[in-house]
């Protein structure tokens, strides 16, 4: 009997560390981190753009812990990318707030905006 190698490897092979998987993991962790940051914003009554910075920090810590536990940075590249972006945007918003500028760089909207 002859062994035939499958055309597509099983999950956990080379495709588990490619773009779509890392992007999906990054988006899932981003949603989780932002939900946690939103809860912190609501619990402590701080400005919403501080939540973006907190969400980025939480996401970075989560992705670091997952990377250490699985010993594979390739699966969590998307999470690191989203975390760094959240920290940069949140940090710029905090700097703008401390500088006394009128508007944050990216103002998050909550709820639906009604049309005219």
UniProtKB/Swiss-Prot annotation:
UniProt KW keywords: Host membrane, Membrane, Transmembrane, Transmembrane helix
Bilayer-crossing regions: 20-40, 53-73, 76-96
UniProt keyword Transcription, yes or no: no
GO cellular component: host cell membrane; membrane
Record's bilayer topology term: Multi-pass membrane protein
UniProt source species: Acidianus bottle-shaped virus (isolate Italy/Pozzuoli) (ABV)
Protein name: Putative transmembrane protein ORF116
Location (main, coarse): host cell
Ribonucleoprotein is among the record's keywords: no
Entry's localization field: Host membrane
């Amino acid at each position: 009997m002859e062994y035939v190698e499958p055309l597509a490897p099983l999950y956990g092979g080379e495709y588990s560390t490619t773009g779509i998987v890392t992007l999906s993991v990054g988006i899932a962790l981003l949603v989780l981190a932002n939900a946690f940051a939103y809860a912190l914003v609501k619990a402590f009554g701080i400005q919403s753009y501080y939540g973006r910075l907190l969400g980025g920090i939480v996401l970075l810590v989560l992705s670091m812990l997952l990377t250490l536990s699985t010993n594979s940075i390739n699966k969590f590249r998307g999470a690191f990318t989203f975390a760094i972006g959240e920290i940069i945007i949140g940090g710029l918003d905090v700097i703008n707030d401390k500088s006394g500028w009128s508007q944050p760089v990216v103002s998050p909207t909550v709820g639906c905006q009604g049309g005219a």
